[in-house]
């Protein structure tokens, strides 16, 4: 890679991180497009990677939010674990900024669930006395297909949750992250517990040192 291209990607990543921090949004794709447009870039090959943007975002958050971000992130991960344990029959996976380590107190918790039908998840939410809003999301999958996925939003203890419900299949095709078109990075209950235990024992602000990310393949 040329030094000029590398420098441009770093500038776009920094600008995207600045947008994400200032707008308090998790929309990585929007921030990247807006940052690229500011630099007159439209070619995909000149865009920074997810890792580059997230690293720049963590640096911005440390400067702007300080300990406030780390405290919010830890609370969100603890709340995510509670929700995953309450919904463990659906083999939940945590995805998104709460897992990546870039969430703040304006972020929501996003979980991927497996169920034979979406109604099974609704019954579980009803049993937990949780009111919800039904949504839909368009996603691409690892086999090249494109599908509409049922989603359910709810709020608990002033934290927003988004549940995405996928078919309960033995060899389920993997949903792709809209930003980089790769399988979502994810953590199951066991992995999230390990992450929290590691963070509590080490007191580390650095997510990548505490827990290696994996693409969405495992549950439990």
Each language-model region and where it sits:
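Catalytic core of pol beta-like nucleotidyltransferases
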Residues: 2-25, 32-105, 115-220
């Amino acid at each position: 890679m040329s030094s000029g291209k590398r420098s441009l990607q770093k500038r776009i990543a920094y600008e995207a991180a600045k947008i994400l921090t200032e707008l308090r949004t998790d929309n990585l794709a929007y921030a990247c497009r807006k940052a690229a447009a500011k630099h007159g870039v439209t070619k995909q090959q000149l865009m920074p990677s997810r890792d580059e943007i997230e690293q720049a975002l963590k640096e911005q958050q440390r400067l702007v939010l300080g300990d406030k971000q780390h405290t919010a992130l830890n609370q969100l991960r603890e709340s995510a674990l509670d929700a995953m344990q309450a919904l463990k029959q659906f083999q939940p996976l945590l995805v998104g900024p709460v897992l990546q380590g870039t969430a703040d107190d304006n972020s929501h918790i996003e979980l991927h669930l497996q169920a034979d039908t979406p109604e099974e998840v609704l019954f579980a939410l009803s049993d937990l006395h949780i009111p919800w809003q039904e949504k839909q999301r368009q996603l691409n999958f690892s086999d090249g297909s494109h599908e509409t996925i049922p989603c359910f939003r709810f709020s608990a203890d002033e934290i927003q949750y988004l549940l995405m419900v996928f078919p309960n299949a033995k060899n389920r095709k993997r949903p792709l992250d809209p930003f980089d078109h790769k399988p979502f990075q994810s953590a199951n209950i066991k992995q999230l517990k390990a992450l929290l235990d590691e963070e509590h024992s080490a007191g580390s602000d650095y997510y990548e040192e505490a827990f290696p990310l994996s693409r969405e393949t495992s549950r439990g």
